[in-house]
């Protein structure tokens, strides 16, 4: 019997510290974001927390790591090289898959920097000469399907959007993969449901219709900076959608401290067995196991 495949999931590192910004870089939405960072966010997004979380994750020796966006904060040019160095420290491109978040496409001027900087971490197995969404990467029994919900938005908005072209391509991919023997994991930054108008995935209804028609085994997302488990309709059974807190965060108000998920995936008869272990920053004792849940 083969050992279970172990997939780690972290999100929203918002890599600190924010580099020095030139005045000309802080026009429009970035001015709001820079003010928010200097007054507030720098207090609870900590590099030492992020490094401790990644170190603990690597000690678990996962077979693959999924990172669901928001590596940077304001998408300043000066943020991308440090983010690339950090991601290389998490693992090589064959062992880590990443999709962008809204902060990675914060403004139109640098919306394409994420793909150019991290292309080898989000390139599909059959599209090695190009980078586009959706993409598919097969790792053991797992098929990672990456989509991008990252689009520039006006100030005070953090919505996501997939668009007709990406949804159409995803429809084709999911239809084909429904006939394949794979544990399908959809990676997207935004949650599939949100009560907040300013933070929602605007075409989530179309995505949910595709999932109901074709199915996947698991959805992983970030964005909300909280522990989250939601269940959505699939063709035969409910689909779990799992969110995770920011990987660099201290606890504040209703936002929990940094955590990551570790999924153990293996065949169970004609189906799949998937168990989730949550590890994160405890109150006094560093990174520890917070809970275990069987999802299927």
Positions of the model-derived regions?
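Internal alpha/beta domain cores that form substrate/cofactor-binding pockets in large enzymes
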Residues: 40-53, 60, 74-96, 193-195, ...
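N-terminal active-site segment of His-dependent metallophosphoesterases
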Residues: 1-80
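Conserved beta-sheet core of the metallophosphoesterase superfamily
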Residues: 196-269
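Active-site neighborhood of phospho(di)ester-bond hydrolases with catalytic His/Asp-centered motifs
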Residues: 9-11, 64-69, 95-102, 148, ...
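Active-site environment of divalent metal-dependent phosphoester hydrolases
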Residues: 14-17, 73-76, 102-110, 152-156, ...
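Extended active-site neighborhood of metal-dependent phosphoesterases/phosphodiesterases
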Residues: 81-169, 212, 235-238, 262
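A short C-terminal boundary segment appended to hydrolase-like catalytic domains
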Residues: 1, 265-296
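Beta-strand-turn-beta hairpins that frame and shape the catalytic cleft
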Residues: 1-8, 135-146, 175-183, 233-240, ...
């Amino acid at each position: 019997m083969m050992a279970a495949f172990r997939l780690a999931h972290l999100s929203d590192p918002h890599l600190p510290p924010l580099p020095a910004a030139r005045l000309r870089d802080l026009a429009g939405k970035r001015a709001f974001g820079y003010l928010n960072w200097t007054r507030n966010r720098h207090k609870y997004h900590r590099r030492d927390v992020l490094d401790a979380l990644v170190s603990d994750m690597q000690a678990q020796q996962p077979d693959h790591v999924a990172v669901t966006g928001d590596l940077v904060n304001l998408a300043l040019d000066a943020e991308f090289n440090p983010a690339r160095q950090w991601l290389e420290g998490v693992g090589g491109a064959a062992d880590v898959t990443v999709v962008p978040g809204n902060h990675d496409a914060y403004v139109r001027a640098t919306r394409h920097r994420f793909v150019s900087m991290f292309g080898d971490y989000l390139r599909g197995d059959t599209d090695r000469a190009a980078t586009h969404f959706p993409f598919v990467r097969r790792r053991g029994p797992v098929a990672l399907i990456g989509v991008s919900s990252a689009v520039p938005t006006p100030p005070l908005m953090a919505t996501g959007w997939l668009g007709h072209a990406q949804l159409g391509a995803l429809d084709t991919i999911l239809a084909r993969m429904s006939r394949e023997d794979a544990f399908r994991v959809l990676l997207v930054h935004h949650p599939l449901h949100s009560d907040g108008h300013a933070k929602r995935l605007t075409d989530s209804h179309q995505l949910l219709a595709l999932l109901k028609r074709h199915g996947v085994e698991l959805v992983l997302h970030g964005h909300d900076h909280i522990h989250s488990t939601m269940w959505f309709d699939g063709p035969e059974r409910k689909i779990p959608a799992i969110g995770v807190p920011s990987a660099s965060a201290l606890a504040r108000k209703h936002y929990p401290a940094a955590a990551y998920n570790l999924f153990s995936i293996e065949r169970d008869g004609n189906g799949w067995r998937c168990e989730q272990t949550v590890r994160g920053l405890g109150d006094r004792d560093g990174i520890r196991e917070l809970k275990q849940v069987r999802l299927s």
